[in-house]
């Protein structure tokens, strides 16, 4: 265990050092500034010692000592704001670079199935939290490392002054005492940090309960159901489950080791003080030497304390950075089909897309969601995929989007396996709205043009997409039109209803079509619209997108009757397919469910 901690500690320091170039040349200036700040306390010690010596003597030269001490104090006061400014600048630059790395790994590189696994969810929680908590960011770790320069310069200066007054033996003893104290303090911090990282799952549970119980999103339901006492009890229980083991471990880690290294430091300090007393008793020391020796000894003895400008920053900040590295490692474990950055661009389907004996099961689950599925999506036609909840409809969309790879079988475009194409370029060929589409807390315009950010300057395409989606009325009601932020959490912002949000999300997908996407996939696009509005939307939508390869997922059979072809999915397999008229004439599952739903909405 001890060897593992030592190895982990060395690796952490190396990782911090490798981040130094990210901040740029400002690190050199900050290092020089901390070097100077580290020398200033030594100047104060020398200045006061000279002043005391002159007072005890003739008094001549006293002002030189006083002047050196005063200048040292003033420079510390003057330079401290600059030190803080450089610390902030370095932290921001490094954190910005780390945030970009985290976003790249999670949003473009890491497999979705890997990101959904509990160990990586814990890592992502630590990384995100670390990037927003000032004292725990990777940038703070880099700035904290530079701040340690001042501390070690003070230590070196104190040791040198001790050696000049009492000789090399005293210098070695005081150095050993200081380093024992320092390594004892840092070792305890490292062991505690390791234990905290191992409790990530318990921490995630505790934070979830606390966040949910204190959030506005859950406030209405908590009040109406009167569940606040339960949330309080659950928060106490989960917090105790997370914190109590850490408190016990902290006492175990801190108490005995602190006692041990404190005794070592005390012994070293007593030994050096005895040397100082003996030298003074023999008359070997002047007043200058005695004053200098007393103050110089105290500098290393203060080295075993907690350094507020560096210790938690380097320890906790590196935990966040190590979480980012873990996510990047997961991103490097992509399946062979996803490692094709140099592969051909995704084509515009000419003949169509085919699912060939495709099976799929989510990682960690034994049951296949799709089982040897064969499906043709002819180019330029609209295909509706219907089925009850849990039939595998959304999973099919995820496979088509290359967010997941089939467990067995393959998906092809015009006869070429989808795995042969570059994933990103293929995804740009698709305009997709998922069931759980994102409600961006941005202005309305951004919520639409994020469907194709490269075309954000095309205002005409933006307006067409809004009109096609039936969102023009929504925009007209907003106080600032397209410039209105779609969240009441911001001044002047507005919350939208579920149906209004759905129209905005549809506009986003249709804007991607305007920008060149050739396959449009809508997963339950109108689930929050009433039946009449849904039918009207589909009638208009299928008319506007005629000639485009369109896939519409729905559990309402009555709303997709105008699609060129309807596919019924049940238990991960296709049970029926054909036009609405053909399926009704067949009198099978589709016809039965269509009539059942029609009676419910009659």
Ranges and model annotations:
Residues 1-14, 92-139, 202-211, 215-245, ...:
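Extended non-transmembrane interhelical loops and adjacent amphipathic helices
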Residues 1-41, 64, 122-157, 241-244, ...:
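Membrane-integrated ABC transporters
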Residues 25-82, 152, 156, 163-189, ...:
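Transmembrane helix-loop-helix hairpins at lipid-water interfaces of multipass membrane proteins
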Residues 293-330:
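Cytosolic ends of transmembrane helices, especially the final helix of ABC transmembrane type-1 domains
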Residues 410-412, 445-491, 547, 585:
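ABC ATPase nucleotide-binding domain helical subdomain, centered on the C-loop/LSGGQ "ABC signature"
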Residues 472-504, 508-525, 529, 600:
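ABC-fold ATPase nucleotide-binding domain signature/coupling loops
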Residues 539, 547, 555-602:
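C-terminal portion of ABC ATPase nucleotide-binding domains
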């Amino acid at each position: 265990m001890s060897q593992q901690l030592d190895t982990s500690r060395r690796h952490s320091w190396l990782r911090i050092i490798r981040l130094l170039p990210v901040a740029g040349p400002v690190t050199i200036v900050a290092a020089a500034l901390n070097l100077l700040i580290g020398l200033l306390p030594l100047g104060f010690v020398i200045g006061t010692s000279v002043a005391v010596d002159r007072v005890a003597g003739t008094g001549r030269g006293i002002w030189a000592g006083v002047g050196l001490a005063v200048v040292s104090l003033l420079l510390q006061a003057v330079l401290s704001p600059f030190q803080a400014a450089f610390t902030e600048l370095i932290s921001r630059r490094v954190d910005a670079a780390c945030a970009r790395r985290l976003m790249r790994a999670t949003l473009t590189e890491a497999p979705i199935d890997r990101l959904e696994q509990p160990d990586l969810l814990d890592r992502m929680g630590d990384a995100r939290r670390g990037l927003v908590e000032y004292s725990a960011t990777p940038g703070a770790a880099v700035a904290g490392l530079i701040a340690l320069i001042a501390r070690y310069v003070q230590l070196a200066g104190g040791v040198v002054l001790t050696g000049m007054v009492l000789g090399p033996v005293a210098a070695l003893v005081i150095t050993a005492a200081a380093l024992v104290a320092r390594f004892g303090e840092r070792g305890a911090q490292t062991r505690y940090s390791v234990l905290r990282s191992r409790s990530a799952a318990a921490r995630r549970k505790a934070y979830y309960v606390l966040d949910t119980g204190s959030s506005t999103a859950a406030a209405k339901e908590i009040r109406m159901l009167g569940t606040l006492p339960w949330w309080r009890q659950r928060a106490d229980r989960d917090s105790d489950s997370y914190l109590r083991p850490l408190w016990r471990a902290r006492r175990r880690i801190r108490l005995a080791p602190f006692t041990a290294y404190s005794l070592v430091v005390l012994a070293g300090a007593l030994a050096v003080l005895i040397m100082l007393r003996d030298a003074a008793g023999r008359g070997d020391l002047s007043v200058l030497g005695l004053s200098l020796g007393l103050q110089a000894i105290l500098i290393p003895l203060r080295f075993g304390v907690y350094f507020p400008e560096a210790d938690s920053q380097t320890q906790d900040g590196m935990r966040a950075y190590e979480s980012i590295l873990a996510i990047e490692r997961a991103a490097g474990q992509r399946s062979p089909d996803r490692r094709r950055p140099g592969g051909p661009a995704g084509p515009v389907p000419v003949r169509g897309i085919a699912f060939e004996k495709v099976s799929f099961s989510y990682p960690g689950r034994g049951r296949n969601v799709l089982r040897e599925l064969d499906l043709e999506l002819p180019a330029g036609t609209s295909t509706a995929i219907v089925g009850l909840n849990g039939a595998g409809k959304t999973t099919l969309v995820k496979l088509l989007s290359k967010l997941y790879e089939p467990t067995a079988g393959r998906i092809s475009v015009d006869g070429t396996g989808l795995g042969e194409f570059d994933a990103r370029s293929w995804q740009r060929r698709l305009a997709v709205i998922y069931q759980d589409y994102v409600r961006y807390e941005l202005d309305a315009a951004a919520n639409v043009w994020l469907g194709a950010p490269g075309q954000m300057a095309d205002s005409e395409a933006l307006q067409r997409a809004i009109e096609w989606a039936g969102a023009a009325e929504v925009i007209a009601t907003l106080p600032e039109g397209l410039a209105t932020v779609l969240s009441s959490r911001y001044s002047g912002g507005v919350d939208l209803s579920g149906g209004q949000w759905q129209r905005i999300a549809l506009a986003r997908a249709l804007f991607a079509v305007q920008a060149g996407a050739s396959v449009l996939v809508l997963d339950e696009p109108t689930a929050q619209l009433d039946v009449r509005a849904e039918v009207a939307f589909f009638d208009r939508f299928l008319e506007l997108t005629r000639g485009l390869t369109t896939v519409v997922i729905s559990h309402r059979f009555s709303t997709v009757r105008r699609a060129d072809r309807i596919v019924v999915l049940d238990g991960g397999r296709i049970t029926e397919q054909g036009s609405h008229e053909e399926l009704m004439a067949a009198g099978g599952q589709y016809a039965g469910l269509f009539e059942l739903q029609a009676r419910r909405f009659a």
